[in-house]
């Protein structure tokens, strides 16, 4: 079945897209084969949430604007020369221009609106007319690797929660959350890796079943009583996907006087039209109402979010460690009259910012060969190059044992400024000498230390009050372009929705060449260095010390850095 409109063909149930494997090229070089394979990988049915609709994750986060645009992007990448650059505007290939061999092969801008018009209402009107596409973060930038992409960040957060609130011991404790989509689906596995049990409330049964199949959740429950019994009846951490609505289950726990140890949420609350099921509605009713009365859906969804947030606040008052996990649900509740919605913190200022100050964030890579052995060899190389980090080694061991690859084999690994370029150069050398069967691509989430401005998430509560300053991700994208990343993206609205974030991404191909080594050395140093720069500029001492140790040239801070011991 296909569905076409002014938007072009957005639904085609006859299509199954998978990235090519092996060393046979469809494009003219690995520098254009890499974005081709990663675009296709984003739409692999083992990777994407709704591949037939081009939706990768995060509500309506798409890889291409419509199927006509997808086909044309593929066609262009197959013919693109190594001195040309393809421009993609909100999922639509709009131009090919002469550049040079060290320039990016693809430059992408997704979902960007002039600030006064940067809201869901205006975006949705443009989207209906086929003029825009929501790229989320890694959906429209072609570097989504399935739920693994956020597992380690979520794991690091839960480990930090255990350290801060429970003396580092999560045994016998449990987390309540909502949402098992592409991002939220990482929560159950991350929680059990960190030693917590978890009840994850999800209204779409197919998503629970998918997480069961891929090993991200342990069990499914149809009632709250059943879920509570499951986590009580075990000596080991266990995760349960509970079929229900978070706006119903969270208040029910308050009513029953049952207080989880930790409370958070990863529903797609950032998009009230497409991402959150109103209380009392069926999935079918919501789908029908989205066609008939969008305003009513948004109104009902935001009212339901307010109910959920009030319950989260009540549970916080009763002693639960409560945190916002970056979906902007507090903002939605605030707009619905929950004046104290921001009384519980976001996860970045509460637990992650010290890592950002050292440029540490979600470094990821994928094996274009399709062979898992290439990833296992790179895992070992990471251990060799970073021998004195048992926490990182433990993560890599757990990842190999417990994480199922989705699509092309890939790995996520939080490392910082002092290590990223070293790892990239080592991977490139492994390709050069034949240790790996084909090139590797290295990218990251847009959720990183220097690549995002998001006052309700990554840049919440900055020391100098610069939460909303979005010059930083723009500079990051420009620098990665100048440095020669293979493709660079600049997006708006990812994670927290329209009007609340701007962010940039980069991917670089390790094809084993000497030219690639030069590009890798530049890009994988500069990219995390912008994060250290951004946090040092905001006044964070950890970032200043890192800048001094890594010999960054920060003109307004150099005199101060020179005095640090």
Curated annotation (Swiss-Prot):
Cellular compartment(s): Cytoplasm
GO annotation, cellular component aspect: cytoplasm
Cofactor binding notes: Binds 1 NAD(+) per subunit.
Binding site for NAD(+): 58-59, 136, 182-184, 202, 207, 245-246, 266-270, 276-277, 325, 495
Gene3D superfamilies in alphabetical order: Urocanase like domains (3.40.50.10730), Urocanase superfamily (3.40.1770.10)
Reaction equation(s) it catalyzes: 4-imidazolone-5-propanoate = trans-urocanate + H2O
Cofactor(s) required for function per UniProt: NAD(+)
Record GO biological process: L-histidine catabolic process; L-histidine catabolic process to glutamate and formamide; L-histidine catabolic process to glutamate and formate
Leading EC class: lyase
InterPro entries from the UniProt entry: Urocanase, Urocanase-like, Urocanase_C, Urocanase_central_sf, Urocanase_CS, Urocanase_N, Urocanase_Rossmann-like, Urocanase_sf
Keywords tagged on the record: Cytoplasm, Histidine metabolism, Lyase, NAD
EC number: 4.2.1.49
Domain of life the protein comes from: Bacteria
Primary localization: cytoplasm
Gene Ontology terms for molecular function: urocanate hydratase activity
Pathway: Amino-acid degradation; L-histidine degradation into L-glutamate; N-formimidoyl-L-glutamate from L-histidine: step 2/3
Active site (UniProt): 413
Family: Belongs to the urocanase family.
Functional note: Catalyzes the conversion of urocanate to 4-imidazolone-5-propionate.
HAMAP family: HutU
Name of the protein: Urocanate hydratase
Species annotation: Vibrio cholerae serotype O1 (strain ATCC 39315 / El Tor Inaba N16961)
Originating gene: hutU
């Amino acid at each position: 079945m296909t569905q076409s409109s002014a938007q072009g063909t957005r639904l085609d149930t006859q299509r199954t897209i998978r990235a090519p494997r092996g060393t046979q090229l469809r494009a003219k070089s690995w520098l254009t084969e890499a974005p081709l394979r990663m675009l296709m990988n984003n739409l692999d049915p083992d990777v994407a949430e709704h591949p037939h609709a081009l939706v990768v994750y995060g509500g309506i986060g798409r890889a291409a604007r419509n199927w006509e645009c997808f086909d044309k992007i593929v066609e262009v990448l197959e013919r693109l020369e190594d001195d040309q650059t393809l421009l993609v505007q909100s999922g639509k290939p709009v131009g090919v221009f002469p550049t040079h061999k060290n320039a990016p092969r693809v430059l992408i801008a997704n979902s960007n609106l002039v600030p006064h018009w940067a809201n869901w209402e205006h975006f949705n009107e443009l989207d209906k007319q086929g003029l825009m596409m929501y790229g989320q973060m890694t959906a429209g930038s072609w570097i989504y690797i399935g739920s693994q992409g956020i597992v380690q960040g979520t794991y690091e957060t839960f480990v930090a929660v255990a350290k801060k609130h429970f003396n580092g011991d999560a045994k016998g404790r449990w987390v309540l959350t909502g949402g098992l989509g592409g991002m939220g689906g990482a929560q159950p596995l991350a929680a059990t890796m960190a030693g917590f049990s978890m009840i994850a409330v999800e209204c779409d049964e197919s998503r629970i079943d998918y997480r069961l199949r891929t090993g991200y959740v342990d069990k499914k429950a149809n009632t709250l009583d059943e879920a509570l019994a499951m986590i009580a009846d075990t000596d080991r951490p266990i995760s349960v996907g509970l079929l229900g609505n978070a706006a119903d289950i969270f208040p029910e726990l308050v009513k029953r006087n049952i207080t989880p140890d930790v409370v958070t949420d990863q529903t797609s609350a950032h998009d009230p039209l497409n991402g959150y099921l109103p209380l009392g509605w069926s999935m079918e009713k919501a789908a029908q109402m989205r066609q008939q009365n969008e305003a009513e859906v948004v109104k009902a969804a935001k009212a339901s979010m307010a109910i959920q947030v009030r319950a989260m606040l009540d549970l916080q008052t009763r002693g639960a460690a409560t945190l916002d996990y970056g979906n902007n649900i507090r903002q939605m509740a605030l707009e619905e009259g929950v004046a104290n919605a921001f009384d519980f913190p976001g996860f970045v200022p509460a637990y992650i910012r010290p890592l950002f100050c050292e440029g540490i964030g979600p470094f990821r890579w994928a094996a274009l060969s399709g062979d898992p052995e290439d990833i296992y060899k790179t895992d070992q190389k990471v251990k060799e190059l970073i021998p004195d980090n048992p926490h990182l080694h433990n993560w890599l061991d757990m990842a190999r044992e417990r994480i199922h690859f989705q699509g092309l084999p890939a790995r996520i690994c939080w490392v910082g400024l002092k290590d990223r370029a070293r790892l990239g150069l080592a991977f490139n050398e492994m390709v050069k000498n034949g240790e790996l069967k084909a090139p590797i691509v290295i990218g990251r989430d847009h959720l990183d230390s220097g690549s995002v401005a998001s006052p309700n998430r990554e840049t919440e509560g900055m020391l100098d009050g610069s939460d909303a300053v979005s010059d930083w991700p723009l500079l990051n994208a420009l620098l990665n372009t100048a440095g020669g990343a293979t493709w660079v993206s600049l997006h708006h609205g990812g994670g927290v929705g329209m009007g609340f974030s701007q962010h940039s991404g980069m991917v670089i191909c390790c094809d084993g060449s000497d030219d690639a080594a030069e590009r890798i050395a530049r890009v994988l140093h500069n990219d995390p260095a912008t994060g250290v720069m951004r946090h040092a500029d905001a006044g964070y001492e950890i970032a200043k010390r890192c800048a001094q140790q890594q010999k960054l040239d920060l003109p307004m801070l150099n005199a101060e850095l020179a005095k640090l011991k």
